[in-house]
């Protein structure tokens, strides 16, 4: 959700190319482009440290101030250096309050399944259609006490108010399984027990 803490002052940039981008990043800024709602793309720079903190939250919505004019923008794409993990460029989509957008929301697993089993997350995110200024940080799946073979599908949990599932409702998100190593140990124990009985 956009609020006072999401306000970011941007500067319009007119220099492009790899050399210009390096200079921008060396100055503690991030090159970005903001577009949407039929407007021409605007190339800007943003303060790297402030934006880096805001991007700790998935699907961040920023309140961008460009020469005194503010626009809400959803972070659509983050390009990072694959080694240093430094943000190299951002794509920002202009949104309006009350507007619905489709976003990938992280799936978070809580609780401990039945002893000897583990929760295997098949899909790390789920696509929802939500208001741009009311995007949930995550969807929680509670697996407390769940037994082997239990499956969780997209339709199996309540969505936040105002959110609509934008996936196949039968999409498999998570499985409760017995780890292969543990299963092999159990099978080996059964074989040994059978051998002991046969020897008696």
Swiss-Prot record:
Alphabetized GO MF terms: 5S rRNA binding; structural constituent of ribosome
BP GO terms, sorted: translation
Keyword Mitochondrion assigned: no
Pfam family, one: Ribosomal_TL5_C
GO CC field: cytosolic large ribosomal subunit
InterPro entries: Rbsml_bL25/Gln-tRNA_synth_N, Ribosomal_bL25/Gln-tRNA_synth, Ribosomal_bL25_b-dom, Ribosomal_bL25_C, Ribosomal_bL25_long, Ribosomal_L25_dom, Ribosomal_uL5_bac-type
Record has Plastid as a keyword: no
Role of this protein: This is one of the proteins that binds to the 5S RNA in the ribosome where it forms part of the central protuberance.
UniProt xrefs under NCBIfam families: bL25_bact_ctc, PRK05618.2-1
HAMAP family: Ribosomal_bL25_CTC
Assembly information from the UniProt record: Part of the 50S ribosomal subunit; part of the 5S rRNA/L5/L18/L25 subcomplex. Contacts the 5S rRNA. Binds to the 5S rRNA independently of L5 and L18.
Name this polypeptide is given: Large ribosomal subunit protein bL25
Organism name: Leifsonia xyli subsp. xyli (strain CTCB07)
Taxonomic placement: Bacteria, Bacillati, Actinomycetota, Actinomycetes, Micrococcales
């Amino acid at each position: 959700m956009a609020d006072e803490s999401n306000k970011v002052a941007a500067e319009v940039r007119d220099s492009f190319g790899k050399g210009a981008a390096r200079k921008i990043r060396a100055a503690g800024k991030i090159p970005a482009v903001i577009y949407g709602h039929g407007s021409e793309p605007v190339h800007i720079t943003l303060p790297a440290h402030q934006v880096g903190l805001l991007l700790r939250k998935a699907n961040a919505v920023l309140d961008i101030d460009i020469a005194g004019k503010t626009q809400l923008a959803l972070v659509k794409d983050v390009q990072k250096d694959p080694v240093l993990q430094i943000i190299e460029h951002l794509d920002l989509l202009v949104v309006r309050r009350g507007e619905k957008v489709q976003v990938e929301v992280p799936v978070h697993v809580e609780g401990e399944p039945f002893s000897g089993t583990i929760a295997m997350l098949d899909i790390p995110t789920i696509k929802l259609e939500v208001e741009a200024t009311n995007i949930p940080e995550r969807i929680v799946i509670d697996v407390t006490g769940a037994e082997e073979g239990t499956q969780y599908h997209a339709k199996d949990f309540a969505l936040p108010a105002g959110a609509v599932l934008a996936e196949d409702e039968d999409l498999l998100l998570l499985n409760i399984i017995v780890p292969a190593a543990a299963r092999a140990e159990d099978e080996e124990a059964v074989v040994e027990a059978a051998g002991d009985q046969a020897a008696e």
